[in-house]
Amino acid sequence: MTTATDLDLERRTIRKLFLRLLPFLFLLYIVSYLDRINVGFAKLQMQGLLGFDERVFGTGFGIFFAGYFFFQVPSNLLLEKVGVRRWIAGLMIVWGFVSCSMIFIRTPFSFYVLRFLLGAAEAGFFPGMILYMKHWFPSGARARAVALFMTANPLAGVIGSPISGLLLVLHIGKLAGW
């Protein structure tokens, strides 16, 4: 039998989760989405500097999703063995390294390899986040938490354009903005 005190404690705990955990997960999803679409913004400068044509970019976009597709199941199987917290942190570190490695792109092949690796690294992120929320949010609050989490996707599109535009005009040393 639940008492009014128990219900109040549960309500306060859920509120804390929404105020403390969900914004962090939201931010991680924004970073994930921006990382996925950033090459679309960098395309114009990359075309000029590297000489890539539309076919190279189209193939690179497709190869990302091939890596994403092929590594979703293995990533989720590992997620169960390693643990959600460690697995998501590891994925983010790997995709950060892969994203940083984009500065070394000189050929279409290197572009394809890095796009595939980025897709593979990001494959387990979204399912892992949903599982993570399942562990933290009770069933009565989970749908609302996931719905709020999902709004990070369109928000990333809104804030990603200006951020990408600013990054493209930055030139540090001999490094291009992309």
Please state what every model-predicted region is.
Residues 45, 76-77, 166:
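Membrane-interface helix termini in secondary transporters
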Residues 70-109:
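Conserved MFS/SLC helix-loop-helix module at the cytosolic interface between two early adjacent transmembrane helices
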